[in-house]
């Protein structure tokens, strides 16, 4: 049975390790040292590297990991998966929407989705983890109760990307790359103070973070209830954006105003 474990990195990153008890694929290793410690402590071999986008805190550890683990457990070159539309160091397989990547160690199939917005070529991976169910590895596109900043894409692109993710089965577990949940929930509460599900989630988040536990994974069904960026078309969210001074001629402009509000929220 496949398991997913977080490897904390930097101040608030999560590198996700997908493993079968013998070999691990690591998602978005921004630095190598935490991965090396995890592998040593867990007795796992590195089987693959999986990248969602080009930012350094997501691929900065690739060179170091390849230097230490040039070969996969099978003896061939270590697979490095990444978006076709971005520069990824050491990449062996360039992926885009509709591609399906198959790993041997661990045995894992990853379906690729294009999710531009945070960066122009950002991709996400949907995995069927067997008994553990479906999982989404979405980098900096969808966060718990939030979404990534628009560094390279447009509001319309990010809205379309989030719509695509929101359409996944509700039990899909969401593995994003940052522990931003506490600040995201504070903003979400400002947008929807009357959202009862969000109030309950805020209490849960505070309890988890008080003991330094991850708030991830969440699920797509949960995000539909508590994430303002998946709820941007809801009347209450639209009204809040308008009251904050946002203009909304269409859904994309409304989303852009919501994202701009978050960018300046303190």
From Swiss-Prot:
Zn(2+) 2 binds at residues 57-58, 140, 178. Its EC number is 3.1.2.6. Its cofactor is Zn(2+). One of its GO terms (biological process) is methylglyoxal catabolic process to D-lactate via S-lactoyl-glutathione. The keyword Acetylation does not apply. It catalyses: an S-(2-hydroxyacyl)glutathione + H2O = a 2-hydroxy carboxylate + glutathione + H(+). Keywords: Hydrolase, Metal-binding, Zinc. It holds the Pfam family HAGH_C. HAMAP family: Glyoxalase_2 (MF_01374). NCBIfam families: GSH_gloB. Monomer. This is Hydroxyacylglutathione hydrolase. The gene is gloB.
């Amino acid at each position: 049975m496949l398991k997913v474990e977080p490897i904390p990195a930097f101040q608030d990153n999560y590198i996700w390790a997908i493993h079968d008890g013998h070999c691990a694929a690591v998602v978005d290793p921004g630095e190598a040292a935490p991965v090396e410690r995890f592998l040593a402590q867990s007795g796992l071999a590195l089987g693959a590297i999986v990248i969602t986008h080009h930012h350094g805190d997501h691929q900065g550890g690739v060179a170091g990991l390849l230097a230490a683990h040039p070969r996969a457990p099978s003896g061939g070159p270590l697979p490095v998966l990444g978006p076709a539309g971005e520069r990824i160091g050491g990449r062996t397989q360039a992926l885009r929407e509709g591609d399906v990547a198959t790993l041997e160690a661990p045995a894992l199939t990853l379906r690729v989705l294009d999710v531009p917005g945070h960066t122009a070529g950002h991709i996400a991976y949907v995995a069927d983890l067997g008994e553990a169910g479906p999982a989404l590895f979405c980098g900096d596109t969808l966060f718990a109760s939030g979404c990534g900043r628009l560094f390279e894409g447009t509001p319309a692109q990010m809205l379309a990307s989030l719509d695509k993710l929101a359409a996944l089965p509700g039990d899909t577990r969401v593995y994003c790359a940052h522990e931003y949940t506490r600040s995201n929930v504070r903003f979400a509460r400002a947008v929807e103070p009357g959202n009862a599900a969000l109030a309950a989630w805020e209490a849960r988040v505070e309890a988890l973070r008080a003991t330094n536990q991850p708030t991830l994974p969440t699920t797509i069904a949960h995000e539909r209830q508590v994430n303002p960026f998946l709820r941007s078309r809801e009347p209450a969210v639209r009204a809040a954006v308008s009251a904050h001074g946002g203009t909304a001629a269409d859904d994309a402009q409304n989303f852009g105003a919501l994202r701009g509000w978050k960018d300046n929220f303190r």
